[in-house]
């Protein structure tokens, strides 16, 4: 009897975690993520990313040579800080991440997404650190970058770090693929093929991000930073970054 009850409780908890995770990465969340390409639009206009193969290469490069040292790493560190209720450390990570985002549009896009995400979920998650962080944003002590807020909310929900990282990377990859399919353009099936091929790289990215090497924080693909800055001067644009 007791073992059956425990199994049912574990199952219900697992389903609750899944529901929370799906809500956190819901593409219909009103935060404006679909408005940002983070430099991809420049790559497409310059005919560097112009096919299914080049888009697939671009996504994998971003995942394994950029995100794991930047947004993914800061998400991982923020998750740790949230576990220990270390508000000061969360502020430090916000400042550090701000310094690594050299392209203005990408920098502003990230904290706008983070502020909107926090505004949604703080209504459901009554946590003192979340409230303190929102207050720090309103007082302009921190910016509220998306990966930091994402980690804080996920940890508050009781999600694991591995699940949080996978969801974050998956969400980012889907955004890039969706934008690439629209910009190049490609067929919807091409986009699905690219996404299917990311299953193993996504797992690899999670493994590499669980315990980030602090010496590699901020390491990035310079080409992407340059295109993200060039995006400000494009003659025609579909995206805000």
Language model segments and positions:
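Charged, compositionally biased N-terminal leader segments and the immediate start
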Residues: 1-19
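Glycine/small-residue-rich interface belts in oligomeric ring/scaffold proteins
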Residues: 17-85
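A short glycine/serine-rich beta->alpha loop
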Residues: 21-30, 59-65, 99-106, 134-140, ...
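Inter-helical turn/loop segments and adjacent helix faces that build the functional surface
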Residues: 46-53, 124, 128-132, 156-164, ...
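Internal, conserved structured core segments that host functional sites
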Residues: 72-73, 77, 84-154
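A contiguous pocket-lining binding segment that forms or flanks enzyme active sites
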Residues: 139-184
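C-terminal auxiliary extensions adjacent to catalytic cores
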Residues: 171-241
């Amino acid at each position: 009897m007791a073992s059956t009850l425990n199994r049912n409780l574990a199952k219900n908890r697992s389903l609750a975690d899944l529901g929370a995770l799906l809500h956190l990465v819901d593409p219909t969340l009103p935060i404006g993520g679909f408005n940002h390409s983070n430099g991809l639009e420049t790559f497409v206009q310059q005919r560097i990313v112009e096919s299914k193969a080049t888009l697939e290469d671009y996504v994998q490069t971003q995942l394994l040579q950029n995100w794991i040292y930047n947004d993914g790493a800061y998400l991982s560190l923020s998750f740790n800080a949230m576990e220990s209720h270390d508000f000061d450390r969360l502020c430090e990570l916000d400042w550090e991440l701000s310094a690594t985002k050299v392209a203005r549009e990408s920098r502003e896009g990230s904290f706008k997404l983070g502020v909107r995400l926090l505004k949604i979920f703080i209504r459901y998650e009554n946590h003192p650190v979340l409230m303190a962080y929102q207050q720090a944003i309103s007082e302009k002590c921190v910016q509220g970058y998306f990966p930091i807020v994402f980690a804080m909310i996920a940890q508050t929900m009781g999600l694991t770090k591995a699940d949080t990282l996978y969801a974050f990377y998956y969400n980012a990859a889907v955004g890039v693929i969706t934008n690439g399919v629209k910009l190049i353009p490609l067929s919807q099936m091409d986009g699905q093929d690219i996404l299917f091929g990311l299953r193993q790289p996504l797992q690899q990215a999670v493994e590499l991000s669980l315990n980030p090497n602090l010496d590699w924080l901020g390491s990035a693909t310079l080409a992407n930073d340059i295109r993200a800055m060039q995006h400000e001067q494009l003659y025609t644009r579909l995206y805000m970054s």
